[in-house]
């Protein structure tokens, strides 16, 4: 079952989170890898915000109030863009986890909305895999030594 989610900035924690939208936010249970998950609050996001977004294979924590640990997706359409060509975005996100200024939250949120939620599929350990940290569960975050090539959750 595809989960309909949107990218939403949490200014209190300065992280980007995924919030369920559409049917899930209206109270229907969400089916996950560990069975049916409780529905999040309908006030998490406006019903029409990001309603065109659809992702498969979300981690269980994606449905928590804190948002997901990380999502592992790759995009054939965007993989060769300037942003991804030199692993710029993973470096940016790594700096953000360290509290360093690298990219404005507005620019980062716009990038996720424009690029990462279009034509993405979960591809396991594919060579061009990128793991984008969208907030929540920071203690599970692991990053390879600089230059940071990818993120993963422990």
From Swiss-Prot:
Ranges for region Mitochondrial targeting sequence: 68-117
Entry keyword Lyase: no
Gene Ontology biological process terms from the UniProt entry: DNA-templated transcription; symbiont-mediated activation of host NF-kappaB cascade; symbiont-mediated arrest of host cell cycle during G2/M transition; viral genome replication
Locations listed in the record: Host cytoplasm; Host nucleus; Host mitochondrion
HAMAP family to which the protein is assigned, alphabetical: HBV_X (MF_04074)
Assembly: May form homodimer. May interact with host CEBPA, CFLAR, CREB1, DDB1, E4F1, HBXIP, HSPD1/HSP60, NFKBIA, POLR2E and SMAD4. Interacts with host SMC5-SMC6 complex and induces its degradation. Interacts with host TRPC4AP; leading to prevent ubiquitination of TRPC4AP. Interacts with host PLSCR1; this interaction promotes ubiquitination and degradation of HBx and impairs HBx-mediated cell proliferation.
Family the UniProt entry places it in: Belongs to the orthohepadnavirus protein X family.
Full protein name: Protein X
